[in-house]
Amino acid sequence: MTLYEPFLERAQQVLTRRLELAPYPIPVGFERKEALVRGEAVVTTSTAWQSPKLRQIRAAHVQGGGALQVLNFVISPRLEYDLPFFGADLVTLPGGHLIALDMQPLFRDDPAYQAKYTEPIVPLFEAHRAHLEWGGDFPEEARPFFSPAFLWTRPKETGTVETRVFAAFVDYLNAYLDFVERAEPVTHPEGLAAVERAQLRYLHYRAEKDPARGMFRRFYGPEWTEEYIHGFLFDLERRREAVHR
């Protein structure tokens, strides 16, 4: 079993227990992709679900030996809810581990939104931050898309990933699903429009700045990569365009 497969397995167990899951359509050619790189197979697998309040729950898992392991796990709410996104980027490269966990806010600087979705998880963040050293600087342009409870760390030991990071991942996911259970739909037209704009802004940023783009291009080529990013990983823009045609 790879380093991040237990994370995905636990996520699926938690999601199955707490949500009414249904399959989310994965475009042809994206469920599994394989390339031979320097004599070693690099395999990318995709899984996805949806639920009554969550538009897309999806995971991209990359396995290329012990020095290349990635799990990108993102939950996108339906446009009728002002829920934050759930984001987990778990990356192991030859240079070490890079871990990012957060509930990315739609309206980061809105005090009412912070009180609703960020302040309740600050104690959880503080509890895990005590054992996971801050990972250092990250791009200034990314700051609007992360909450004050953003857990960003570069563990030196794989054992830390298997224990401390795993525990943080499960706790953050359960806390997010607590928010989902309590979420009520937005009904005011202005509020719905604001939610859609905020979701599109976040997903556009993620698609344009996806740090995996270079890796995927090297492994699978630019055409497959761009279609994978825009047609599956961050697909809201594409889906909205299809609806309005």
From Swiss-Prot:
One of its GO terms (molecular function) is cobalt ion binding. It catalyses: (3Z)-phycoerythrobilin + oxidized 2[4Fe-4S]-[ferredoxin] = 15,16-dihydrobiliverdin + reduced 2[4Fe-4S]-[ferredoxin] + 2 H(+). InterPro entries: Ferredoxin-dep_bilin_Rdtase, Phycoerythrobilin_Fdx_Rdtase. Its EC number is 1.3.7.3. Keywords: Oxidoreductase. Catalyzes the two-electron reduction of the C2 and C3(1) diene system of 15,16-dihydrobiliverdin. Belongs to the HY2 family. This is Phycoerythrobilin:ferredoxin oxidoreductase.
